[in-house]
């Protein structure tokens, strides 16, 4: 056993031939002492168990078990030596392991690295394989039960008999909770697969210092083990270890692999094949030998300490000096460009800021900020440092230029002016000079492509801000950019113009050949630009027509006109003062009729002026206004439309006058009257709202709201105007939010204001919560959610409209599509106290009847929303002051509403943090009666939710099991089971668990519990649970229970169960059956005198050694109680059968058990 600091010394205490020494361990079952064999001087560990903790009928079985276990012998298990029984205690003598347990090493030196864990777990598995081959289930594998020697070898301790002492408890849950397998928690019996789960938990314990769920209490941890699909795995583990752990943590024990197969896993095999690592490299390799076995314990301890120091050491944030020379400030070294295909689709939408055009012999390059010369004329008089920097600098980005202009035949040029606008803006940011005397001719570029994408920090249009950046000095750029576009098949001529981006309103030259020049350059170099086609949604851009020579005026107009498409007529764009960002949003409106006429006249005058410069070559009789008006333009002169426009203008003027009256200087009657008239006008002409905001904005209204001595009825009138203005207008709402409208209006929500003012405030808030994501986020940012909760606190009878509006607003918060997760809204509302208020509103709205018909459903849907939130919200909702009013309303709800509320309670019960609150609120008492409904709407849903809730509440907790029993759940459970309802999967585990609660058994007696359990023996998947319930029950109330079992009919049920049990459940029924046979003599005799022994003999060839061992134990027990043991031996010819097992069985324990049984048989036959 493990070695610890001396706690207590036993003086002059001798047990057999052993002296008791210091206490080296304590547990719930007893105390462990270091002992000294006074005959040979060997040190041993002696476990002392008080006889009062062992039932008298089980003492002999435990001593017999020790006699069996002392035959086990393996390097990786602690050896049982003997037992000594005194008047008061039972002493078990064990092998002494001097270096303590792995859990003690963790506490002393820190958590283990993965490589060392692998070395130790390999030995654990080897010891476990041996135990399982002998038919022994450890049941309590953990770090404290894995002991180490000074050589670093490990040994498994506390197996077999140690767990028998815990079997005496009524619950019969064996093992330590955090390492316990789910099937043990659910009382389905322990198997060898249960040990595999515990090994996985032990690995996590060694890696992290604690087992899974160690941060929880024992009961919550048990709940999570059963509830979760898999325990949380440590971060940073290797993929092989992760796969290994997933094999251990299969929830279904039948899918869990054996210890033998785990030894063959690649994670374990790596520790065997791993070669020793040099000292100091890796930290752990030098703690193992060449085969992966542990070295001296001192070396291992040192390595563990070093490993923990490294993982706990804070990383240094000091920057190391760079081996590369530091780049000069202002220089940007770009990576080498990649070759690109001649793909022209996106070149002008993604254009770099800096463009340098070299001479005609060199390709266009994108250079750094500093001026540069053409590639072939680069000076070489740089300093060595500069040369080194230039060598390290990647080559500049190149702008590829086609040698020949590309001619496009695409007549669709709707996007051309968009690109011209962007390029003109870009060229406005270039500073051209004339430093070079020999300039090459300007290239005629159709579509320049760039070999590198633009910087992500560029402006939206892909260019700079137009000369404001001091770093963008392009004084040495020798070449201009020129565009030679083809706007359409009917465009002819060659004109010149310029686009200047220094002004706020950019203009673009309106000629077939557009050129860009720099006004600051003495020798303007024109840049031919190739415009691109804008998308169909873009707004037309402004274009200045040229004044150079052209054809006749009629031809000029034809060149720029569109046939039959007034929307695509570019003649009216020249006067539009636009912003590219505004254009992109599509907010530039179409000019009215007068503007279009002015544009057409101006264009015609220019065309006429140009015709006089054509030396009389044009046709003087041509009507230059022939195409100015089409027949469709007659609609603009419609009398009705003009009357409507006049009426609109008068109304606009009236609204502006009324708005001017909304000032603090005006009398209150005037302000109220103005507000009333404004509301009427806005209802009749909603488009006037936009005009109002554009001309006056919302500031005048905001100023009125800030008046301190304003009367409540005036305030109410102003709020009505605000609500009318923002109604169904998202733009105005957002503008109002941006100028602080939300906090200015929210202050009127307090109970000190009249109900009318609060109602208008609630209307405003409701609109803010339901229109757009932006207004909702602003409302929340202004801490508006508590306001909604305050509205709900208003007296329902007096302010029901206010309460309803608050409920609507809360629902809108959850229904509006928002990037904020709904769980965050639940957390915020929960923090504001909403959950305490909603149940009261639900009660009042139910009592209100038809007047509030829809609001109970809305509130119930909110309950479902909150019950599905995170653990913090669920725990708040499960508070007694919240859940109790909800439970009180259950009987008043309609069936559909009841099903929804029960669903929300079920979702709460799935969180272990809520179970105690639900119990204290009386959830079991309120919900159990609903199981009695047999007909009606939504009955199946109601039963499902209630049984699920009871399943979570009663699981593992005897106190709640008893509460459910006295509240009458047993008859309902029996109904669902006997009627073969789909819900019996929840009813069966509940009723089987009730037998483990001593208090609940009194209710089971009232409902024929023993007979019901016997009937469950026919249920294929619940045979083990039902038989285990009988075994637990007969232990405490032997006489009453055995009187029911010990009948011929029920004995036949037991034999039939034994005969027909499938292989998966057969191993599970043997232990509870053995317990019943050992405890109840009448049952034992009835089975022993029947053909049951024949059935046992047929099963003795089972492959599982644990099954064979339990079968031999059953034969032994039947033999000891048989009224005619000699006849039994002869009748069933047991001696040769047992002799064969004793001679040939591979399990040491099975052989030993058979040998002892054979000795008893031979002694009886001799007698």
UniProtKB/Swiss-Prot annotation:
ATP binds at residues 24-32, 47. Residues 18-268 form the Protein kinase domain. Keywords: ATP-binding, Cell cycle, Cell division, Cytoplasm, Cytoskeleton, Kinase, Nucleotide-binding, Serine/threonine-protein kinase, Transferase. GO terms for molecular function: ATP binding; protein kinase activity; protein serine kinase activity; protein serine/threonine kinase activity. GO terms for cellular component: centrosome; cytoplasm. Residues 365-376, 508-517 have a biased composition (Polar residues). The keyword Cytoplasm applies. The active site is at residue 140. It is found in: Cytoplasm, Cytoskeleton, Microtubule organizing center, Centrosome. Disruption phenotype: Prominent defect in cytokinesis and an impairment of multicellular development. In multinucleate sepA-null cells nuclear division proceed normally and synchronously. However, often cleavage furrows are either missing or atypical; they are extremely asymmetric and constriction is impaired. Null cells form fruiting bodies, but these are smaller than the wild-type ones. SMART domains: ARM (SM00185), S_TKc (SM00220). It holds the Pfam family Pkinase. It comes from the Eukaryota. Residues 311-553 are annotated as: Disordered. Coiled coil: none annotated. Residues 313-329 have a biased composition (Basic residues). Residues 337-346, 451-475 have a biased composition (Acidic residues). Residues 377-405, 431-448, 493-507 have a biased composition (Low complexity). Induction: Down-regulated by Pseudomonas aeruginosa, PAO1 strain and up-regulated by PA14 strain infection. Its EC number is 2.7.11.1. InterPro entries: ARM-like (IPR011989), ARM-type_fold (IPR016024), Armadillo (IPR000225), Kinase-like_dom_sf (IPR011009), Prot_kinase_dom (IPR000719), Protein_kinase_ATP_BS (IPR017441), Ser/Thr_kinase_AS (IPR008271), STE20/SPS1-PAK (IPR050629). Belongs to the protein kinase superfamily. Ser/Thr protein kinase family. Serine/threonine-protein kinase involved in the spatial and temporal control system organizing cortical activities in mitotic and postmitotic cells. This is Serine/threonine-protein kinase sepA. It comes from Dictyostelium discoideum (Social amoeba). The lineage of its organism: Eukaryota, Amoebozoa, Evosea, Eumycetozoa, Dictyostelia. The gene is sepA.
């Amino acid at each position: 056993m493990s070695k610890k600091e001396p706690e207590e010394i036993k003086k002059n205490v001798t047990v057999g031939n052993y002296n008791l020494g210091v206490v080296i361990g304590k547990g719930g079952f007893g105390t462990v002492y270091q002992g000294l064999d006074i005959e040979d001087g060997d040190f041993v560990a002696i476990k002392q168990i008080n006889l009062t903790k062992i039932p008298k009928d089980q003492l002999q079985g435990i001593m017999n078990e020790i006699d069996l276990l002392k035959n086990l012998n393996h390097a990786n298990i602690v050896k049982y030596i003997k037992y000594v029984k005194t008047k008061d205690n039972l002493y078990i003598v064990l092998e002494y392991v001097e270096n303590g347990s792995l859990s003690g090493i963790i506490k002393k030196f820190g958590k283990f690295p993965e490589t060392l864990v692998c070395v130790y777990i390999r030995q654990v598995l080897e010891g476990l394989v041996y135990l399982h081959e002998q038919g022994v289930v450890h049941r309590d594998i953990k770090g404290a039960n894995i002991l180490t020697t000074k050589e670093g070898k490990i040994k498994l301790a506390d197996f077999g008999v140690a767990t028998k002492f815990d079997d005496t408890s009524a619950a019969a849950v064996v093992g330590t909770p955090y390492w316990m397998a789910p099937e043990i928690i659910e009382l389905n019996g322990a198997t060898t697969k249960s040990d595999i789960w515990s090994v996985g938990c032990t690995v996590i314990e060694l890696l992290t210092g604690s087992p899974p769920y160690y941060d929880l209490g024992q009961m919550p941890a048990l709940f999570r083990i059963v509830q979760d699909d898999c325990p949380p795995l440590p971060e940073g583990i290797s993929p092989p270890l992760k796969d290994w752990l997933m094999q251990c943590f299969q929830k279904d024990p039948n899918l869990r692999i054996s210890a033998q197969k785990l030894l063959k896993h690649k994670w374990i095999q790596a520790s065997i094949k791993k070669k020793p690592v040099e000292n100091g490299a890796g930290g752990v390799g030098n703690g193992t030998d060449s085969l992966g076995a542990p070295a001296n314990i001192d070396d291992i301890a040192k390595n563990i300490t070093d490993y923990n120091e490294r993982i706990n050491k804070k990383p240094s944030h000091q920057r190391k000096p760079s081996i590369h020379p530091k780049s000069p400030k202002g220089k940007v070294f770009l990576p080498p460009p990649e070759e690109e295909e001649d793909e022209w689709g996106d070149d002008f939408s993604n254009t770099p800021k800096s463009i340098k055009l070299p001479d005609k012999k060199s390709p266009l390059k994108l250079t750094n900020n500093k001026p540069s010369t053409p590639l072939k004329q680069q000076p070489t008089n740089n300093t060595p440092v500069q040369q080194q920097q230039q060598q390290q600098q990647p080559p500049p980005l190149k702008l590829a230029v086609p040698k020949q202009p590309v001619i496009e035949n695409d007549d669709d040029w709707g996007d051309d002016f968009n690109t011209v606008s962007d390029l003109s803006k870009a060229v406005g940011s270039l500073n051209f000079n004339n430093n070079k005397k020999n300039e090459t001719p300007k290239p005629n570029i159709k579509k320049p492509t760039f070999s590198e994408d633009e910087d992500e920090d560029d402006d939206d249009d892909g260019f700079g801000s137009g000369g404001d950046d001091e770093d963008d000095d392009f004084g040495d750029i020798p070449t201009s950019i020129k565009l030679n576009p083809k706007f359409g098949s009917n465009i002819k001529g060659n004109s010149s113009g310029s686009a200047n981006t220094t002004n706020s309103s950019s203009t673009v030259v309106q000629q077939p050949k557009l050129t860009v020049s720099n006004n600051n350059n003495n020798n303007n170099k024109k840049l031919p630009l190739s415009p691109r086609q804008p998308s169909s949604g873009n707004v037309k851009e402004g274009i200045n027509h040229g004044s150079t020579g052209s054809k006749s005026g009629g031809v000029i107009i034809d060149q720029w006109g569109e046939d039959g498409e007034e929307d695509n007529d570019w003649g009216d764009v020249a006067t539009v003062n636009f912003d590219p960002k505004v254009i992109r949003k599509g907010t530039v409106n179409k000019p009215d009729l007068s503007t279009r006429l002015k544009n057409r006249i101006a264009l015609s005058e220019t065309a006429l002026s140009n015709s006089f410069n054509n030396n009389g070559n044009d046709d003087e009789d041509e009507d230059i206004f022939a195409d100015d008006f089409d027949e469709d333009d007659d609609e603009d002169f419609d009398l009705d439309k003009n009357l409507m426009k006049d009426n609109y203008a008068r109304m606009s003027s009236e609204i502006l006058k009324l708005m001017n009256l909304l000032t603090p200087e005006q009398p209150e009657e005037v302000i109220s009257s103005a507000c009333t008239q404004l509301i009427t006008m806005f209802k009749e002409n909603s488009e006037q709202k936009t005009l109002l905001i554009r001309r006056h904005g919302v500031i005048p209204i905001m100023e009125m709201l800030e008046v301190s001595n304003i009367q409540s009825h005036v305030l109410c009138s102003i709020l009505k105007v605000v609500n009318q203005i923002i109604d169904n207008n998202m733009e105005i709402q957002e503008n109002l939010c941006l100028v602080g409208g939300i906090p200015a209006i929210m202050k009127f929500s307090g109970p000190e204001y009249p109900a009318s003012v609060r109602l208008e405030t609630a209307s405003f808030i409701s609109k803010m919560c339901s229109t757009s994501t932006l207004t909702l986020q602003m409302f929340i940012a202004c801490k508006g959610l508590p306001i909604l909760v305050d509205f709900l606190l208003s007296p329902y009878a007096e302010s029901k409209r206010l309460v309803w509006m608050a409920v609507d607003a809360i629902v809108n918060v959850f229904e509006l599509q928002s990037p904020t997760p709904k769980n965050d809204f639940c957390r915020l509302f929960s923090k504001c106290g909403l959950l305490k208020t909603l149940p009261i509103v639900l009660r009042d709205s139910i009592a209100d009847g038809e007047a509030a018909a829809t609001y109970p459903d809305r509130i119930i849907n909110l309950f479902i929303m909150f019950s599905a939130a995170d653990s913090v919200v669920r725990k708040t909702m499960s508070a007694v002051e919240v859940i109790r009013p909800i439970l009180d309303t259950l009987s008043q709800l309609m069936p559909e509403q009841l099903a929804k509320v029960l669903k929300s309670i079920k979702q709460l019960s799935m969180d272990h943090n809520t179970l105690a609150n639900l119990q204290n609120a009386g959830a079991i008492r309120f919900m159990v009666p609903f199981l009695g409904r047999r007909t009606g709407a939504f009955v199946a849903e109601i039963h499902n939710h209630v049984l699920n809730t009871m399943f979570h509440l009663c699981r593992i907790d005897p106190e709640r099991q008893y509460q459910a029993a006295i509240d009458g759940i047993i008859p309902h459970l029996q109904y669902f089971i006997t009627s073969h309802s789909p819900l019996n999967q929840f009813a069966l585990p509940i009723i089987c668990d009730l037998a483990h609660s001593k208090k609940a058994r009194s209710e089971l007696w009232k409902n024929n519990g023993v007979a019901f359990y016997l009937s469950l023996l026919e249920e294929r998947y619940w045979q083990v649970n039902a038989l285990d319930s009988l075994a637990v029950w007969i232990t405490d109330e032997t006489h009453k229970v055995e009187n029911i079992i010990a009948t011929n009919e029920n004995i036949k049920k037991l034999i039939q169960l034994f005969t027909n049990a499938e292989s998966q459940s057969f191993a599970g029924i043997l232990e509870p059956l053995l317990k019943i046979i050992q405890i109840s003599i009448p049952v034992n005799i009835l089975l022993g005198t029947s053909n049951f022994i024949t059935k046992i003999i047929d099963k003795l060839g089972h492959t599982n050694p644990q099954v064979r061992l339990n079968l031999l134990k059953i034969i032994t027990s039947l033999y000891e109680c048989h009224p005619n043991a000699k006849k039994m031996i002869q009748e069933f010819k047991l001696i040769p059968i047992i002799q064969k097992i004793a001679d040939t069985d591979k399990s040491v324990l099975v052989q030993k058990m058979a040998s002892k049984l054979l000795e008893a048989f031979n002694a009886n036959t001799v007698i």
